[in-house]
Regions:
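Short Gly/charged-rich anion-binding patches and loops
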Residues: 2, 31-32, 160, 164
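C-terminal regulatory/effector modules of DNA-binding transcriptional regulators
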Residues: 135, 152-258
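Interdomain hinge/linker segments and adjacent boundary elements that couple functional modules
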Residues: 4-9, 22, 26-149, 232-258
Length: 258
């Protein structure tokens, strides 16, 4: 059976199938492994052994206990990526949010039941572990100045959040850039997105969150357009030092007015 036929039968992308065949999925989902075993009619001790290895692998990652909260298995994709480039227009990127900031976001949501808020926050904090994982991705984010100045929760929450960003900028895998208001109109004004890039020659994926669901697009032309869009906002953004200086200035203003 050809790779294309297998991907079609499983309703997987070709990139996902390629990663599984090369054993490059770092945290395989049990349901995905079971689907492959069913397709290839693997039974008995071999099946039990492979499922046992799957559970051992999953047990090493804190966020898998929250797998039901991530449509499209975003943490799996982040873990398999070699680089994530993100543009955020209104919010601090999820990978860089503090618990208090994330709590304020979920508490303001009309679609997250109050009883689910803490688990949502915990899942977001667990997801950050990908940045410290061996072989984890490089994370480059461009944050619109509007996201820094929008008060989420309170000024105290924002002070803590922005100071946390400054601390995370020292992480060797993290680059934080600010797109200032003075940059004016730009090509990414339609909204936020993340570009996940995998080992060559696998295609990249564009992730877009609508607030209700996450969309994942592998279409090559679509991904290429978003590479150009990211490059454009990256070129308009302040350099890392000026970005951190602006973040610190805004944090100091919040702190003074808290």
């Amino acid at each position: 059976m050809s790779a294309a036929a297998v991907a079609e039968r499983l309703e997987w992308s070709t990139g996902k199938l390629t990663r599984s065949e090369r054993n490059e999925w770092k945290f395989p989902k049990r349901t995905d492994v079971e689907a492959l075993l069913d397709l290839y009619e693997v039974e008995g001790e071999d099946r039990a052994h492979l499922l046992s290895l799957t559970e051992e692998s999953r047990g090493r990652s804190d966020w898998h206990q929250y797998a039901d909260l991530f449509p499209g298995a975003l943490p799996d994709l982040e873990a398999e990526a070699v680089r994530i480039r993100s543009y955020e227009s209104l919010l601090i990127p999820g990978l860089l949010q503090t618990p208090a900031y994330a709590t304020a976001i979920f508490e303001s949501s009309q679609v997250v039941p109050p009883e689910d808020t803490q688990r949502k926050v915990d899942s977001r904090m667990a997801r950050r572990g990908v940045l410290d994982a061996p072989g984890g991705p490089q994370f480059i984010c461009v944050i619109d100045e509007a996201a820094l100045r929008r008060v989420v929760g309170s000024r105290k929450v924002m002070t803590e959040q922005l100071r946390f960003l400054i601390g995370m900028a020292a992480h060797y895998k993290v680059t934080i850039l600010v797109l200032p208001f003075e940059a004016g109109a730009h090509t990414a004004m339609d909204g936020a997105f993340a570009l996940l890039e995998f080992p060559s020659p696998e295609p990249g994926i564009v992730s877009i969150s609508t607030g209700v669901e996450s969309l994942y697009v592998e279409d090559e032309a679509y991904v290429d357009r978003h590479r150009l869009i990211f490059d454009a906002v990256h070129n308009l953004a302040l350099d890392p030092k000026k970005s951190l200086d602006l973040i610190e200035s805004i944090a100091a203003d919040y702190d003074k007015r808290a």
